[in-house]
């Protein structure tokens, strides 16, 4: 039970206990060791209908389930003489204090303090008054919100609200990108980084380093951070663009066998990254800022890769030894199926070019239950679907 010395706390808030349902919610919290703070947090928790006696949970409910202005929970706190206790606990837990406290300024304090821990540069002077000395508690609180499947969308909405009020994008745009890499408080960080990445790629600056990260390393890192759910496809597209730009000065190998060997070892990646670039590009809501990069990727693929590779391939295929360079598609049945005793499924797909098969092969290799092999064969000419299917089936002539 509650010790006699804490009875004045109960008496001060006796109005709260006038309702049996409210009273029961308080006792359902099963507070083990009563003291003044636990009692006050318990009362606040009961008003918010929280399931645990936790001030962090009270603040979470107040911020995510209510409005920042005319908040219904704060009105309830005031009704039961708990509002001053709420703000005192905000100071105690989060270091937030104000002559006229408000949820708006509390929220800004939380986000600015969190940002200050991860941005390596000085924050704008106008933000300094919002930096709290209780950064550890604030980081733990916001981490729990942003990493929760239940509350991450609420976090994003609160983050966007603060970002708009503080004009965060403009503030970050004036900082070095190196100083922003570790921060994911606001989506604006990714917007600044993406803008910088586009400029580097369009300039073909593939050696750019940001805070120790190469362009693909930065893309991978940011895609795994909080806003990766929204920005992941953009970073994957930029990473594919990097792979294309890196091969801008392409030179084909000499001879069909050398061309094939190099394609199997490395050049297939050009086709693969080109496909992935457009796969992610086509999923973007807005592509306007990416048009110069798309044009560069298209130019490299068409005018520097294909324009160099295809003439070399066409010359090589006309050599006498061309059709002995690798196994032929028309020999597929005799080589793989005629004498096998196991049931075999053959999937024939026009879309499954070698680079697609290579990606599937890589995924199958990661499956411990699967044994995968990848080999190549030379298709028939002319290369069209019906003739290709016939070449894979038992036949005497084509």
Question: In which residue ranges do the predicted regions lie?
Answer:
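Ligand-binding pocket scaffold of soluble enzyme catalytic domains
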Residues: 350
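…; additionally, a secondary subgroup of soluble metalloenzymes is captured
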Residues: 1-344, 353-398
